[in-house]
Amino acid sequence: MLKKIGLSAFTLSLATLGMIPLAQASGDWKIQADAQGMYAQYSGSSTRKNISSEGVLLRADYLDSGGFALGTTATQLQFKASTLTQQGVYASANKHLYLDALPGVLTLRMDGHYISNNDVTGSSNRVKVYAPQVSFLNYRKSFYADLGYAYSSYPKGLSVSQLTPTLGLGFNQAADWLQMRVYWVKPSNAAQAQNTSSTTALESKWTHWFAPSSAWIPQKMDVGALFGQRIYAVDGDAAAVYNIADVQQGSISLASQWRISESAHVMLAAGNERYRNKFISETYDSRYIYLDVKGAW
């Protein structure tokens, strides 16, 4: 597995992030900057040792109208015989629509990714991803739905189509949020995708917000799990592209976020992801730790 980390591997969608504002902006624009890093150790792999990634992201929102985000990442995948280095860039724009016929906000969003690396096979280099999404969040912020699509263009004629319907529900007086997302992924050539013609997976995330009485108590906690299989996936919430052809067979994660000031937060997360390389009949795990520091003004 090699993925490009982005906004945060454990955030909810941009719409549900509005449930807890990071800070009050002094003007019409609200700016948020993220610095993040990830380190993972592989277990059970005969070819991989570890992977690390660092990234920065800047997001700007104009009043309640919409906004944009720009980010970049650098990734190092340490094989037992070599090292792969990768650069990724990310851009996103969204527009909020307020229609009289709808009891909430309709959001149109477009993401783009470009990934380059020194893969000697050339199969994961110069990857382009286009990912539109339409979402709805009611005014009570207790119901969310979206439909996302991603088209990924790989070298050697491979393309990957992905459809991701999502449902989110708030409950317990807005202290809890449950989100479910289905991943339907279809590569154009099974021979370039571990002899897999399509994959289906269900991703679930539960978030609980606390009312911390001290800085040591988390502001919120996230628990996530992935069931089923997916390959060449594009994660819109995490702004991540899984651009090496191993089949992900599930994952589990735990994350906590602390509020360290009126406009600054720290998130720490850990998890385990399982993968299968069918070509060499090998199943292995990636155990990772993730840190995200964000500030807003």
What are these language model-derived features?
Residues M1-F10:
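Bacterial N-terminal signal peptides that target proteins for export
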Residues A9-T11, A15, S256:
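Short, functionally important structural connectors and interaction interfaces within domains
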Residues A15-Q24:
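C-terminal segment of classical bacterial N-terminal signal peptides
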Residues A25-W297:
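Transmembrane beta-barrel domains of bacterial outer-membrane proteins
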